[in-house]
Amino acid sequence: MKKTGIRGQGSGVGVLLALLATPLAAQTSLSIYSDGRVVVRKTIAQRLDKGRNIFSFDLPGLDPATLFSPDSSVAVTSAVLRPATDLETAMRNSIGRTVTFVRGKGDTIQATVLSVTPPQFKMPNGLLQLAQPGEPLFPAEAGLIRTKPEAVVTLEASRVRENTDLVYVSQGVTWEAVYQAVLGGSGSATVTGAATINSAALRVDSASVQLVAGSINRARSPAAPMMQAAGALMRDEAAKSVAYAQEETVGETHVYELPGLISFDIGSPLTTALFPRARADYVQEFVVPGAVPWRGYFGPMAPDPNAVPVQVWYTFKRAHGTAFGDRPIPGGTMQLFQRDSSGRVQLVGEAAFTHTPAGKDLRVQSGDAFDVTAERVQTDYHQASIPNTPPARGSHSRVTASYRVTLTNAKNQAVTVDVREDHWGNWSIIDSSVAPEKLSSSEQRFRVPVPANGTATLTYTVQVDS
């Protein structure tokens, strides 16, 4: 790499100006977060003299406030970010210079720039022109035009260093995890997962890349990243790799190291597998949500039956000691597929889910049932004022409500439907045609069997004191 600049002699202070390559290259390691943050770690293969060193770097997407060196012998004492030169800045830099201008018919004329605002130019005949005489052509001189953003960084070194590491937090690259589960008829599924990287601001050429899954607070507004120009980048390193991401725990996050060196471009998504195909047992459930979550309130309802959704849930078993259970699963999207009679896979559901630690089952709602339907009607509602038990004074409100839920199954096989009831505070089910099962202090369920091509009816009464 060509170096330009000067070194101080006898002062113990070294000053070096150097320009690095445009894309984030092989000396770079990136940690990409799903919220758009990127931790950029860059090894600077430049000698640092003891004392002050000034570098001119190309650090794409730099937020100067976040720049630091993890090297204990090197401190960042200042960082100035200079954008690529626009036309107005180039004209201001040319004040006092003679610039060539291209006019309408393709001929050129030279004029001396006296002022930009207001425009003032001295023409070859000595006259002054108060309008720009054409499209300017600027000489490719250092200091006049910057073709890309540039960071001028001052580093203070306590000893001579042959290279140093710089770290900063950038923006504009996100990743998401998408999983595919092909459901078998025997309650077993094959699961695959991949991460897709999307860059809106950074080009990356042959870098080590980690994906970070976890919830991390953001305490400051991000600086707008300086955009890099898009360009073609080879991705052979990722394409030829047959390895999968390696996971480790760092703090309260999980970090996934992608295999090999990764290249990606602005606006060109890159997808890489997270883990080998795994097999997992699953359970399908039909769930009717409780009256309060479905209606949004607890009170008198219209006497006519209300159609309520029958939700379809899948629980993937992830016991320790299994290929799918031993790995933490970053939150993302689960796509569910099932084969038709011709063996073609059809999309039968899709759901978002949060980060799932190793050993914890993964439960997703894929949609609503087609052939299993439900209607709920409130058959009775009574509200009374009940005296409080002494020594408490006054009274409290007691609401008693009765419901009838009719379940219809148009399938050729019997199903079991979970009918849920959710309330807060002091409540109980005082009567029901099917025994309730307490799931928590706020939720109970009824497991109602429904015959093939038939119906089943559930009745129950809820009592709530408030």
In which residue ranges do the predicted regions lie?
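Short polybasic linear motifs
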Residues: 5-14
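Long, intrinsically disordered, low-complexity accessory segments associated with secretion
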Residues: 15-19, 23-466
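Positively charged n-region of N-terminal signal peptides that target proteins for export
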Residues: 1-3
